[in-house]
Amino acid sequence: MSAGRNPHSGSYTQEVFGPVASFYVVDSEDEAITLANATPFGLGGSVFTADIERGRSVARRIESGMVFVNHSTFTAPELPFGGIKNSGYGRELSELGFGEFVNR
């Protein structure tokens, strides 16, 4: 876990693979979403909240290939996996993943 990081630090501006959780203090939900979307990457993320509907609303506003509510990111064969922005090369797994490899 990493707290009090600057959004301009390497751990924020570079894609980190590993069991890393960074925490940033913000004053509003909108500021949190702006901060989450300010990265050039978008593989996956999570929203943790006691209000599930609010969490889903926030998750829809985050620019990431996969956003989970009250769960860390994970993969399952029936779910499409992949990022957006500078993360990944499209989708894999599920029917959407097969579509990445065929001509239509």
Where are the model-predicted features located?
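Conserved C-terminal structural/oligomerization subdomain of aldehyde/semialdehyde dehydrogenase
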Residues: M1-R104
